[in-house]
C-alpha cells in the first residue's frame, strides 16, 4: 500500500511540474511588442523619444566625455576620476559608448523600417521622424568616432542572425567622417531650423550643420590629420585606419562647414547670449562681459544661443550640483579645475600668465591681502596671488577663496574659505579650494 502511495505522489508531482511549465510558457497579454510600438501615431512618437534616450546625459558626470581628461579633479571616489588616476581599463568601463550607442543606432533603424506602417500617421510626421532618426544615427556615430577613432559604420538595419564571419569591422577614419558628414547634410535638409517650446531639445537643421562643422574641425586637427603616430594603426587585413598624410584641404572643408552653420543659425535668429542687466544688490559683476559669461549657462529665460539642448532633469550626481560650492540642500562641490586649467586663464591685460610682465608667475601661490576697491573678491581678506588681476572669464567661471558668488535665492553675497562644507554662511564653503561656477 505504501508503495502505491509513493507512486501516486510521484505521478502527481510530475503532472504538477508539467502544468507549471505550460503556465510559465504563456506570454502575458500585456507584454509590449514591436507592433505595439507602432500601433498609432502617439506610440510612434514615444518610440522616437526612446531613440533620443540613448543620447549620453551630458549634465551627468557619468556620461560626459569632458571628464576623461585632466581638466578637473575631485576629492570623492567618483568613477570618472579613474581616468585621471590611470586606473581605467577594459574590465572597469566608464562612459562606455560602445555598450549603448550601437543599441541606439539599431533603435533608430527599427523606427525607419516601421514608421510608414503606423495607422493614421501623416506624411509630414513620417518625413520628420525619419529625418530625426538619421540625425541620431549620425550623432551616435560621431560620438563613437570621438571616443574610439575609426569605428564600425552601421549603414542599415543588421540582421540578428548575422554570422560572426559577416560582422562589420572598423572603417578608416576619413571614411567614417565622410559618411557621417553626408548623413548630417541629408538630415538637415529635412529638419526644421528651430523647435517650439514643446519640442525643445529635438533635432534641428542648425544642430546637424553645427555638429558636422565641429566634427570636421576635429578631423582636420593634428591629432588625426597626418599624425605619424598612427602609421601602424591598421585593420587585421592590413588596411590603414588613419592616414599619415597631412591635408590642408581638411581645414578649408571645416571652415566652409562652420560658415554654413553660422549662416543657417543667423537666419533662424539664433544669437550669442548677452546680459543687458546689472545687479544693483551686489558689488560684482558690474562688468557686462563677465555677467554675460556667467549668466549664459544659468539664464533660463534667454536661451537663444543654445543649439542642441540637454532637456533631461539633472539629478543628485549632475555636473552642476557637483561643481558649485557646498549648499546644505544638495550641492556638494565635488568637481574643481586643476591648477593647470587655472593657469590657462589670461591676466586682466589679456595675456597668458607666463607672458604678462605685470604678473609674477613665480609668486602665484603666495597668500596676499585683497586690496580695497576690489569688486571680484572681499577687500581686506586673503587669497592666493594667482586669483588676482585675471580676465573676466576667470571670475565668471571659477569660484575661489574669498571670491564672490551669486546665489539666486538670497540677496546675500558669500565668500569662500577653508576646505570643508558648513551651513549657509560666509565661510567654509569650498571643499577643495576652488570650484567651477
State the predicted function of each range.
Residues 21-66, 234, 386-388:
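Membrane-proximal, proline-rich intrinsically disordered regions
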Residues 39-58, 77-148, 162-200, 205, ...:
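Conserved, well-structured interaction surfaces
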Residues 134, 209-215:
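TPR/Sel1-like alpha-solenoid repeat signature
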Residues 226-246, 415, 419-422:
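A solvent-exposed, charged loop/short amphipathic helix patch at secondary-structure junctions
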Amino acid at each position: 500500500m505504501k508503495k502505491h502511495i509513493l507512486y501516486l505522489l510521484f505521478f502527481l508531482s510530475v503532472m504538477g511540474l508539467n502544468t507549471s511549465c505550460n503556465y510559465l510558457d504563456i506570454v502575458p497579454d500585456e507584454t509590449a511588442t514591436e507592433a505595439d510600438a507602432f500601433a498609432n501615431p502617439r506610440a510612434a512618437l514615444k518610440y522616437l523619444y526612446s531613440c533620443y534616450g540613448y543620447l549620453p546625459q551630458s549634465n551627468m558626470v557619468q556620461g560626459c566625455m569632458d571628464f576623461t581628461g585632466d581638466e578637473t579633479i575631485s576629492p570623492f571616489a567618483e568613477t570618472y576620476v579613474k581616468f585621471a588616476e590611470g586606473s581605467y581599463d577594459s574590465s572597469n568601463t566608464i562612459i562606455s559608448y560602445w555598450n549603448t550607442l550601437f543599441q541606439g543606432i539599431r533603435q533608430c533603424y527599427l523606427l525607419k523600417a516601421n514608421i510608414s506602417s503606423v495607422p493614421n500617421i501623416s506624411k509630414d510626421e513620417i518625413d520628420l521622424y525619419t529625418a530625426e532618426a538619421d540625425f541620431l544615427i549620425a550623432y551616435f556615430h560621431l560620438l563613437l568616432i570621438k571616443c574610439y577613432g575609426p569605428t564600425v559604420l552601421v549603414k542599415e538595419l543588421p540582421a540578428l542572425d548575422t554570422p560572426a564571419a559577416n560582422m562589420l569591422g572598423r572603417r578608416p577614419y576619413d571614411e567614417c567622417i565622410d559618411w557621417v558628414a553626408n548623413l548630417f547634410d541629408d538630415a538637415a535638409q529635412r529638419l526644421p531650423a528651430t523647435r517650439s517650446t514643446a519640442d525643445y531639445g529635438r533635432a534641428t537643421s542648425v544642430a546637424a550643420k553645427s555638429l558636422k562643422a565641429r566634427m570636421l574641425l576635429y578631423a582636420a586637427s593634428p591629432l588625426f590629420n597626418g599624425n605619424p603616430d598612427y602609421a601602424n594603426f591598421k585593420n587585421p587585413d592590413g588596411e590603414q585606419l588613419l592616414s599619415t598624410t597631412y591635408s590642408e584641404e581638411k581645414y578649408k572643408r571645416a571652415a566652409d562647414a562652420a560658415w554654413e552653420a553660422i549662416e543657417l543659425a543667423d537666419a533662424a535668429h539664433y544669437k550669442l547670449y548677452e546680459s543687458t542687466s546689472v545687479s544693483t544688490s551686489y558689488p560684482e559683476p558690474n562688468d557686462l562681459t563677465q555677467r554675460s559669461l556667467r549668466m549664459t549657462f544659468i539664464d533660463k529665460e534667454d536661451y537663444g544661443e543654445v543649439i542642441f539642448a540637454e532637456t533631461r532633469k539633472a539629478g543628485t550626481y549632475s555636473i552642476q550640483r557637483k561643481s558649485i560650492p557646498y549648499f546644505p540642500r544638495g550641492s556638494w562641490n565635488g568637481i574643481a579645475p586643476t591648477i593647470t586649467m587655472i593657469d590657462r586663464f589670461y591676466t586682466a591685460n589679456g595675456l597668458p600668465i607666463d607672458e604678462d610682465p605685470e604678473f609674477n608667475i613665480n609668486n602665484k601661490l603666495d597668500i596676499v591681502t585683497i586690496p580695497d576697491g576690489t569688486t571680484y573678491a572681499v577687500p581686506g581678506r586673503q587669497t592666493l596671488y594667482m586669483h588676482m588681476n585675471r580676465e573676466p572669464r576667470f571670475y565668471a567661471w571659477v569660484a575661489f577663496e574669498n571670491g564672490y558668488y551669486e546665489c539666486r535665492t538670497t540677496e546675500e553675497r558669500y565668500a569662500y574659505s577653508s576646505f570643508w562644507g558648513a551651513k549657509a554662511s560666509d565661510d567654509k564653503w569650498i571643499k577643495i579650494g576652488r570650484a567651477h561656477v
